[in-house]
Amino acid sequence: MKNQINRKFIYFICCVSAMGGLLFGYDWVVIGGAKPFYETFFGIEADPAMQGLAMSIAIAGCLVGAMVAGFFADLFGRKPLLLFSAIVFLLSAYMTGAVDTFVPFLIARLIGGVAIGVASGMSPMYIAEVSPPATR
């Protein structure tokens, strides 16, 4: 019975951790749906360069987050780093919706991208760490 409970718990942990990989797609779907509205709100509907920057700055953040994730995981641990990246992503999502000028919007998107990059890099590592060797 105990083995079954542990197995279910491991599956639960793996499913929750795998959601870190979903953040990238989630971010693109949400920002894509909001695109017509924030372009009008920030007055960038006639500026393709700014439109592209608003969409792609999160990818730059992902790159940074993925590059530093290993260093910080060694420093703080994978689980605390995953929790921290989730909190940072939530805060960046709030900031993205709460700001009223374009530059803070870009900063919030960049910070969210860093959190996505960290979570994307740490999720598979954490899943491998908590999984029993027989089921890896």
What residue spans do the PLM features occupy?
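Transmembrane-helix signature of 12-pass secondary carriers
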Residues: 1-136
